[in-house]
Swiss-Prot record:
Gene expressing this chain: rnf170
Keywords for the protein's UniProt record, in alphabetical order: Endoplasmic reticulum, Membrane, Metal-binding, Transferase, Transmembrane, Transmembrane helix, Ubl conjugation pathway, Zinc, Zinc-finger
Lineage: Eukaryota, Metazoa, Chordata, Craniata, Vertebrata
Record membrane topology: Multi-pass membrane protein
Enzyme class: transferase
Organism: Danio rerio
Protein name: E3 ubiquitin-protein ligase RNF170
Length: 266
């Protein structure tokens, strides 16, 4: 009788006390939590441009600039609306000569320049929406649109482009934290790839550098030699692949910012 009890006790599997959830290993739980966190962070970065509400700390300054612009400009009925899906949160009208900040928010060219001039010319402004430091302004209007806009608007496109170039020349090279670099990645990547596949956009050396970086990242992803091999660590082995992709995006955004800075300096 005692022998059978011993046999039954030896046959019973020992419970896995190290696992937080029965039947699911801790490695799988860790990868799941990290993946959800990474996806949530990327979704937040990509959707930041959808938020167009003025930050409470910038409301008073925006109100003064809005009143100043309304006093200087003609009535809104005479403003030609080229962009049906883009509005400026400063003047509360359709964006004329639209400009995008490095944090991904859209303003009229004259509005963001007036917002800069109302404060101080000695330092970079903070975005009226997210309060991130604005170190780059991207004009979203083309040369072919300037004459049509100038016919119906008192704003001179050439002066706006000059002010934008002056702003970028002053503040595009300012040091930024790692968090600010991550926040800039979606906007800079979008502009970099847009210029990369356009005629007369980025010069060929920069395009070759991007292609080499992409090829290097792809070679690492398909290579069986990993810092964290999937065959040994399971799902944890994909963490280094996510890290390589993230570094690739950050490096391309840094290269594109350097190209924009050199273009302004030249």
């Amino acid at each position: 009788m005692e022998g059978s009890v011993c046999v039954d006790g030896a046959a019973a599997p020992a419970p896995d006390e190290a696992s937080l959830i029965e039947g699911v290993s801790n490695a799988v739980l860790l990868v799941l939590v990290l993946s959800v966190t990474l996806l949530a962070g990327l979704t937040t970065l990509l959707c930041r441009s959808e938020q167009q509400r003025i930050h409470p700390e910038s409301q008073e300054r925006v109100r003064v600039v809005r009143e100043q612009l309304q006093a200087e400009q003609v009535s809104s009925e005479s403003r030609h609306q080229f962009y049906s899906d883009m509005s400026c949160p400063v003047c509360l009208q359709q964006a004329v000569l639209p400009v995008e900040t490095n944090c991904g928010h859209l303003f009229c060219g004259s509005c963001i320049i007036a917002y800069w001039r109302y404060g101080t010319w000695l330092g970079a402004i903070s975005c009226p929406i997210c309060r991130q430091m604005v170190t780059l302004l991207f004009p979203l209007f083309q040369d072919s649109e300037q004459s049509a806009v100038a016919a119906d608007s008192p704003v001179e496109p050439t002066l706006i482009l000059t002010d934008i170039s002056d702003y970028n020349r002053r503040f595009s090279g300012q040091p930024r934290s790692l968090l600010d670099r991550l926040r800039d990645v979606p906007t800079l990547l979008r502009h970099a790839f847009r210029e990369m596949f356009s005629v007369g956009g980025l010069f060929w050396m920069f395009r070759v550098r991007i292609l080499l970086c992409v090829c290097g990242a792809l070679a690492y992803l398909v290579s069986p030699l990993d810092f964290l091999p999937e065959g040994v660590l399971g799902l944890l082995g994909f963490l280094d692949d996510f890290f390589v992709i993230l570094l690739l995006f950050i490096y391309i955004s840094i290269m594109y910012r350097e190209v924009v800075t050199q273009r302004l300096a030249g």
